[in-house]
Structures are given as structure tokens and as C-alpha cells.
Amino acid sequence: MERIGRDGRLRSTRDYERVKSSGTAFRGRHCVVVVYAAPGEPTRVGFVASKRGVGNAVQRNRARRRLREIVRRRWERVPQTGYLMMFVAYRSALVAPHQDLASDVERVLGSAGTLASLPADA
């Protein structure tokens, strides 16, 4: 399984603001994915969990870790150029079974058009 490297992550406030202000939001049961089309740029992803939306620091970190791991396992199926994506966790991301959270992320990425389907033999 591939790691999402430093080049694959949103790091600057400017990047997060650009995605938030100009991106399109796709809502799921456990998270929102905001996708900004950035032709020519490598695909990068960021994870956000607000204090008001999720809870204290331990809960926010756990929600981000859970989302990050699910996206990491699907990273090969995400186009490697052209998108900036921001995942915003809901409180339910803390308690949802892993499979429910994973299927929610897949559904939202699929509706955003940023997740390739699995090969027939997989």
C-alpha cells in the first residue's frame, strides 16, 4: 500500500482557503469532501476536524487519522494530477464502524468523480 507523501498533502493555509472558497462540497454521512479542480497540479489532500464539529484534541486527531487511513488505502485509485481535496470530519466519524466510514468515503469520492472503480478481478 502506498503512502500519501509530503507532496500529496495540503500544507498551507492558502491551499485550504482556496479549496474551501472555490471548491465543490460533496456531503456524506460521516464527512464532507471539498474538491477543487486544479489542472496541472499534483493531487493533494488535507484532513480537517473542527473543535465544534468533532470535539477535543484527542477526538479530532482520531477522526483525522481514521479518514487519512481510509484515503491512504484508496490513494492508488485517485487521479494523481488535477485535484485539491479537503476532508472535513463529522462527529459520527469517531464512532462509525470502519467499514461504514470507508464506504461513505468511497461513495463521496465516487460522486465527486475522483475515485476510479476497482478492476473486475479485484
Where are the predicted features?
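Positively charged, solvent-exposed patches that mediate nucleic-acid binding
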Residues: 1-122
